[in-house]
Amino acid sequence: MGLPGGWELVLIVGVLVLLFGATKLPQMARSLGQSARVFKAEARGMKEDEEAAKREKQAKSEPQQLTAGESSAPTVASPVEETQRNDSKK
């Protein structure tokens, strides 16, 4: 039992026209299309939120992955060391 064929589709459309009337069918189709667009937009929004949460989680975990030889803050030479280096070059 597969998909309905040509005559079966005509019969289904005829029954729909009799049940709902010719004026209601375009309105129902339009409403169905709008609902599908809203559903797609919400699904896309949820996917983007999920990806943003993953990126945020990765950003938080990256600074914690330092090796033993690395330090988290850059080191700055004190002014005393700089003057001693300059004096020794002269």
Curated annotation (Swiss-Prot):
Residues 42-90 are annotated as: Disordered. GO terms for molecular function: protein transmembrane transporter activity. One of its GO terms (biological process) is protein transport by the Tat complex. Keywords: Cell membrane, Membrane, Protein transport, Translocation, Transmembrane, Transmembrane helix, Transport. It is found in: Cell membrane. InterPro entries: TatA/B/E (IPR003369), TatA/E (IPR006312). Residues 42-60 have a biased composition (Basic and acidic residues). Belongs to the TatA/E family. The Tat system comprises two distinct complexes: a TatABC complex, containing multiple copies of TatA, TatB and TatC subunits, and a separate TatA complex, containing only TatA subunits. Substrates initially bind to the TatABC complex, which probably triggers association of the separate TatA complex to form the active translocon. This is Sec-independent protein translocase protein TatA. The lineage of its organism: Bacteria, Bacillati, Actinomycetota, Actinomycetes, Pseudonocardiales. The gene is tatA.
